[in-house]
Amino acid sequence: MSKEDSFEMEGTVADTLPNTMFRVELENGHVVTAHISGKMRKNYIRILTGDKVRVELTPYDLSKGRITYRAR
């Protein structure tokens, strides 16, 4: 799957789950489970409940995603 197949949406972290997983509420009201991307994990980017994040979703499974950016 190439990067062009995925799309990004903005959301807010609603809950922190084990193993660096997060429950994110998207702007359209949907709730997805998301994990941190590799570059964010490598650079020790901390994500807390209430943070605004950008989530990358695939058209194959819209209930899971990858957090690619945390707004300041």
Swiss-Prot record:
* Alphabetized UniProt keyword annotations: Cytoplasm, Initiation factor, Protein biosynthesis, RNA-binding, rRNA-binding
Query: What Pfam families does the database record attribute to this sequence?
Result: eIF-1a (PF01176)
Entry's localization field: Cytoplasm
Grouped into one coarse class, the protein's main location is cytoplasm
Q: GO molecular-function annotation terms?
A: ribosome binding; rRNA binding; translation initiation factor activity
Tell me which InterPro entries the record gives: NA-bd_OB-fold, RNA-binding_domain_S1_IF1, S1_domain, TIF_IF1
Supply the SUPFAM superfamilies for this chain: Nucleic acid-binding proteins
Q: Does the keyword Transferase apply?
A: no
Annotated S1-like domain ranges read 1-72
Disulfide bond positions: none
In terms of SMART domains, this protein maps to:
S1
Please give the GO cellular component terms listed in this UniProt entry. cytosol
Q: Into which family does the record put it?
A: Belongs to the IF-1 family.
Spell out the subunit comment. Answer: Component of the 30S ribosomal translation pre-initiation complex which assembles on the 30S ribosome in the order IF-2 and IF-3, IF-1 and N-formylmethionyl-tRNA(fMet); mRNA recruitment can occur at any time during PIC assembly.
Functional summary from the UniProt entry: One of the essential components for the initiation of protein synthesis. Stabilizes the binding of IF-2 and IF-3 on the 30S subunit to which N-formylmethionyl-tRNA(fMet) subsequently binds. Helps modulate mRNA selection, yielding the 30S pre-initiation complex (PIC). Upon addition of the 50S ribosomal subunit IF-1, IF-2 and IF-3 are released leaving the mature 70S translation initiation complex.
Tell me the protein's name. Translation initiation factor IF-1
